[in-house]
Amino acid sequence: VGSHNGLKYDTDEFLIAGGGRPLIYATYITLLDKGDKVIYPVPSWNNNHYTHLSFCEKIEVETQPENNFMPTAAEIAPHIQEATLIALCSPLNPTGTAFSKSALAEICDLVVAENKRRSPDQKPLYILYDQLYWTLTFGETHHYDPVSLRPELRDYVIYIDGLSKAFSATGVRVGWSFGPKYIIDKMKS
């Protein structure tokens, strides 16, 4: 992760599992309580199911072709104060489109501002960042991630990654998650 993405995480801030799917679900059940709200774009892969299985409420942001089927800060902003989790994926499954640097930075700025606004007795706003397809970017498409753009988000971002897509080995179910140690520890338990 450090040599490819420039992110610095200790080994105890990683969790390895049989693919990305159990890690996404572990993130949901670790961070969310019944009735919490989750923001995610549509189309997207299985966030509706994870939200349902976690007994949470969905806030679906319908993406638009003119935005490359990626959610924008303007679309997310009206819902941000009521949410506990924003589930993002870049490149996005199923469209294959990716965040531009500026579009992701704007969403990150919303999360930074919202977490500063929240009182200590409120849950923070987290980002689940599924980047399983990041190695499959070509040409002028570049991969960006929240903590590289806004290091102050480090305590609020849980990454999902894996090797099956990058190596065209979809039968090899190896995924990893990394993020704040206290969250990864809860996911492990």
Residue ranges and their predicted role:
Residues F14, L125, V157:
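Short, conserved active-site loop motifs that form the nucleotide-linked donor/cofactor pocket
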